[in-house]
Curated annotation (Swiss-Prot):
Listed result of changing G197L: No effect on cis-Golgi localization
Name of a matching Pfam family: Rhomboid
Entry's family note: Belongs to the peptidase S54 family.
Transmembrane segments: 19-39, 63-83, 100-120, 158-178, 182-202
Signal sequence extent: none
Protein name: Rhomboid domain-containing protein 2
Organism annotation: Mus musculus (Mouse)
GO molecular function, one term: serine-type endopeptidase activity
Sequence segments annotated as region (Disordered): 265-287, 318-361
Any one GO CC term of the record: perinuclear region of cytoplasm
Superkingdom per UniProt: Eukaryota
High-level lineage: Eukaryota, Metazoa, Chordata, Craniata, Vertebrata
Biased composition (Polar residues): 267-276, 318-328
UniProt entry tagged with the keyword Chloroplast: no
Length: 361
């Protein structure tokens, strides 16, 4: 069996990236990459970020496009990690079609709540609010849904075990460290996720029957044909089966298993026989237990080893009490000489091979 090459081992070791998660990260790179890596700083504000002045000019497309906008290479890197971590897990849970649907819903409603907060802030003269940009509001919405509906009561955050309901709020505080990220938009996304997780937005859900129909339509049918990425079906039964295969993989499915042939162990066998010559048990070499004298209830009992230094030689040992009783059922003492191994036999010659018999006292 030939071992797979380095390229195949590399692809086997790479984690599977869901389709919609990959294309979300790709769109973020295509939208923000040219501005960040081709233009000289200082950069002008992006025409795709979310602000209230843009909606007054009927630029409603900004309600969606702001999640692909990043104004800093560090924020772009953080956004890619957030997309891979949170969006990827959410897509594996709900499927690719519903992931795209909820991404759109969370994006639009987070933007609406953010604009409402911004209007209140401007009317109250509380200060200028930073423009909403990046995927973090949608990620917090997905995190809010997961934290509410998860069966886990505790989670590990930064090496500390905390209740699961506190995880979104702790990560919300940590989002201050991401450069040029609107904290208000993150709060808006988290509120949307918690509202949906508590079934206050059940009317916005997408049924499984509709998701299965959309699986066969464009562009999802095209995404399904791409072998490099994992398309998650809209069927909950298929997702559970895939999760079961991940938890209980078939033998040989891991690269470390498939690189080596399966060897069947061939251990020398120590045979335990009655006077009728029937095989009862086997021991691997070097693990032969000490066999004290024992008088079994069924009469004479021998352990014959045919794998000594000479293949034609054999040696016979008296069987131990635990071995004899563990192999054959208990027999009454009043019936000596009876073999209780499922077959009737009479004491006689054990074969053409020479063997020494030690009579049990």
């Amino acid at each position: 069996m030939a071992a797979p090459g380095p390229a195949s081992r590399f692809w086997c070791s790479c984690p599977e990236v869901p389709s919609a998660t990959f294309f979300t990260a790709l769109l973020s790179l295509l939208v923000s990459g040219p501005r960040l890596f081709l233009l000289q700083p200082p950069l002008a504000p992006s025409g795709l970020s979310l602000r209230s002045e843009a909606l007054r000019n009927w630029q409603v497309y900004r309600l969606v496009t702001y999640i692909f906008v990043y104004e800093n290479p560090v924020s772009l890197l953080c956004g890619a990690i957030i997309i891979w971590r949170f969006a990827g897990n959410f897509e594996r849970t709900v499927g690719t079609v519903r992931h795209c649907f909820f991404t759109l819903i969370f994006t639009v409603f987070s933007a609406i709540i953010y604009l409402s907060f911004e209007s209140v802030s401007s009317l109250s003269k509380l200060g200028e609010v930073e423009d909403a940009r990046g995927f973090t509001p949608v990620a917090f919405a997905m995190l809010g849904v997961t934290s509410v509906r998860s069966r886990m009561r505790r989670a590990l955050v930064f090496g500390v075990v905390v209740p699961s309901v506190l995880v979104p709020w702790l990560l919300l505080c940590a989002s201050w460290l991401i450069p040029q990220t609107s904290f208000l938009s993150n709060v808006s996304g988290l509120l949307i996720g918690l509202s949906y997780g508590l079934t206050y937005c059940y009317s916005l859900d997408l049924s499984e029957r509709v998701a299965l129909k959309l699986d066969q339509k464009f562009p999802f049918s095209l995404m399904r044909r791409i072998p490099l990425f994992k398309y998650i079906s809209g069927s909950s039964a298929e997702r559970r089966a895939a999760q079961s295969r991940r938890l209980n993989p078939a033998p040989g499915s891991y690269p470390t298993q498939s690189c080596h042939p399966h060897l069947t162990p061939s251990y020398p066998v120590t045979q335990m026989q009655h006077a009728s010559g029937q095989k009862l048990a086997s021991w691997p070499p070097g693990h032969m237990p000490s066999l004290p004298p024992y008088q079994p209830a069924s009469g004479l009992c021998y352990v014959q080893n045919h794998f000594g230094p000479n293949p034609n030689a054999s040696s016979v040992y008296p069987a131990s009490a635990g071995t004899s009783q563990g192999v054959q059922p208990p027999s009454p003492i009043s019936c000596p000489g009876t073999v209780y191994s499922g077959a009737l036999g009479t004491p006689g010659a054990t074969g053409s091979k020479e063997s020494s018999k030690v009579a049990m006292p």
